[in-house]
């Protein structure tokens, strides 16, 4: 009797280990944890500091909500808003904010979408093909330098974003 009971329990245990599947009509998506957002922000800030720049870094979640913002000592107050706008621009267009700035430069008048900015330094954060957030950096002497710091931030968590 025990052998029969054990044999009958194997399929039940196997099904239980597969985990619950989402109900029809529900989506599941990856999301940045606070720890990962902090690591990305810190990686960007460290790169900027190593290059001699004092910057602000903003990380947004997929809903455009601020996950974390780091403002280095000695940065201008405006960098907080600009970093957020760069991250938001990268998030909603799902491309580097520098690409959006170049595209907008050819449009007269340029688009005016609340919360966006036509400056480089914002990047989408991807886990595989899925955008899981964005980063914006402001304060370095040049948009390309802001973007390099943002790239370094994402690289700091690249192994965990696969």
Where are the regions a protein language model picked out?
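Hydrophobic h-region of N-terminal signal peptides that target proteins for export
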Residues: 9-16
